[in-house]
């Protein structure tokens, strides 16, 4: 199928802006017709891009689409192959969690750094076991999770949230789960629509797919979502909810300004659009109020202990709009009855004993240190960064495509995320990559990888020819 002089090449020439779809369709047809049998290896992304006159990013996007459909399978270090016919289509584009190992410098995920919190968590479990205060036999209830909800309310910045009590808080299994709960409580109708940033954390796509909702991407600038685009998108597509990472946007690190938040809240109020503010990447204090404070009857605030204390606990929370906590709690109970009681009790202990605050302060300091190290190494390039964001956003210099740079890094056992992986279905992405700064426990590995990336960025021609 992928040979010169065939009909699919003419289809690509007529494809316009949808070349990746045309390429995916051509490969799909080749598989269906038997021209591409199971196990056949596809050309390398750069080779096929050269043959077709497309960019490597376009080819990579077509491959990713077909991998998502289960028609192709990617094997690290070996290439992309036609999948076996008995392989069921995958429901996920990519895993949300990447497991690091000692051989790779893995910058794909935004993790909490190890600052000794494991010992504090162990001590909390010991205190729980020695207290014998619960038998840990029955299901968790609204009464038995009250201490954890009260501790969470006390943990939150009351000025930023507009005042929060335990009755406003609904607990879940991490921020991703809590976003799903909020979406389930808001979405309705036969064609639910979620409005969100045009670049979003991949979990947004997973949530929309799970809830069978349409995603509509909104353009952003240096101050956040553009208000006019928000209103235009609502008029064109409808939608019940805006899901936004306003304080620390992933992957760009953009912080939505106060004036911009006020403008967006005004539009949401005008059209009765709910807002879910995903605050999971925020670790340091901020002076900008949340949407929950600006629009208390329509806004949800979602976060967790994952980026400030530990991802192992899977402890997340939603601050519901006023008079909506009962509805949200019913959604949670219908989904999983409640967060496991031992986790509720241990997290309440961590929050009330000061262990969580101690850990958060160390995490903030370590994140700032790692960001400075990364910026010092890559400062010659176009890097967007903030000391309180656990990742940096690196624009590619002339001569590099993000997908090609990612492949070149992979050859050096450096794993990164191109901006394409944050694009919505059918959306565009800038020529950039995101680098999580807290992903390498070994600092020499971290610094060596930064040096390698710096060298690659400065020498794209030699790298592409090799």
Spans of features found by a protein language model:
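Short beta-strand "wing" residues that participate in macromolecule-binding interfaces
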Residues: 73-75, 164, 385, 416-417
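Conserved core of the PLP fold type I
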Residues: 135-271, 282-298, 458-465
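Conserved core segment of the aminotransferase class I/II
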Residues: 301-364, 462
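N-terminal basic, amphipathic alpha-helical segments
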Residues: 1-129, 134-138, 333-340, 362-366, ...
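Conserved glycine-rich beta-strand-loop-beta hairpin in the small C-terminal domain of fold type I
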Residues: 364-375, 383-396, 408
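Hydrophobic residues in well-ordered beta-strands that form the structural core
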Residues: 196, 217, 275-277, 347, ...
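Short hydrophobic/aromatic beta-strand micro-patches
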Residues: 319, 393-395, 436-438
């Amino acid at each position: 199928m992928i040979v010169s002089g065939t009909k699919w090449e003419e289809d690509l020439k007529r494809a316009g802006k949808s070349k990746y779809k045309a390429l995916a369709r051509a490969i799909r047809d080749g598989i269906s017709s038997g021209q591409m049998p199971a196990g056949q290896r596809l050309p390398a992304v750069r080779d096929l891009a050269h043959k077709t006159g497309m960019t490597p990013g376009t080819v990579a996007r077509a491959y990713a689409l077909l991998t998502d459909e289960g028609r192709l399978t990617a094997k690290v270090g070996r290439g992309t192959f036609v999948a076996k016919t008995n392989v069921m289509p995958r429901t996920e584009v990519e895993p949300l969690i990447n497991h690091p190992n000692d051989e790779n410098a893995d910058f794909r995920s935004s993790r909490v750094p190890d600052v000794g919190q494991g010992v504090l968590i162990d001590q909390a479990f010991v205190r729980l076991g020695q207290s014998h205060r619960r038998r840990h036999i029955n299901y968790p209830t609204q009464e038995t999770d009250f201490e954890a909800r009260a501790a969470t309310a006390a943990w939150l910045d009351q000025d930023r949230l507009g005042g929060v009590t335990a009755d406003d808080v609904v607990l879940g299994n991490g921020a991703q789960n809590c976003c799903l709960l909020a979406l389930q409580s808001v979405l309705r109708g036969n064609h639910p629509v979620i409005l969100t940033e045009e670049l979003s954390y991949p979990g947004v796509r997973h949530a929309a797919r799970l809830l069978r909702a349409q995603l509509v991407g909104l353009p952003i600038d240096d101050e956040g979502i553009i208000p006019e685009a928000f209103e235009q998108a609502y008029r064109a597509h409808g939608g019940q909810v805006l899901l936004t990472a306003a304080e620390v946007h992933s992957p760009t690190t953009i912080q939505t300004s106060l004036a911009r938040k006020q403008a967006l809240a005004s539009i949401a109020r005008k059209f009765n659009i709910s807002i879910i503010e995903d605050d999971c990447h925020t670790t340091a204090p901020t002076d900008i109020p949340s949407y929950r404070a600006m629009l208390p009857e329509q806004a949800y605030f979602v976060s967790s202990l994952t980026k400030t204390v530990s991802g192992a606990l899977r402890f997340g929370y939603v601050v519901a709009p006023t008079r909506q906590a009962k509805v949200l709690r019913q959604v949670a109970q219908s989904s999983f009855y409640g967060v496991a009681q031992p986790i509720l009790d241990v997290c309440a202990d961590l929050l009330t004993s000061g262990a969580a605050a101690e850990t958060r302060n160390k995490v903030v300091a370590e994140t700032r240190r790692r960001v400075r190290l990364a910026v010092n190494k890559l400062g010659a390039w176009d890097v967007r960064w903030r000391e309180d964001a656990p990742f940096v956003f690196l624009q590619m210099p002339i001569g590099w495509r993000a997908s090609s740079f990612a492949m070149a890094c992979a050859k050096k056992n450096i794993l990164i995320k191109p901006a394409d992986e944050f694009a919505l279905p059918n959306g565009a992405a800038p020529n950039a990559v995101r680098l999580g700064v807290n992903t390498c426990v070994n600092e020499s590995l971290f610094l060596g990888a930064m040096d390698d990336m710096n060298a690659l960025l400065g020498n794209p021609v030699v790298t592409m020819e090799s």
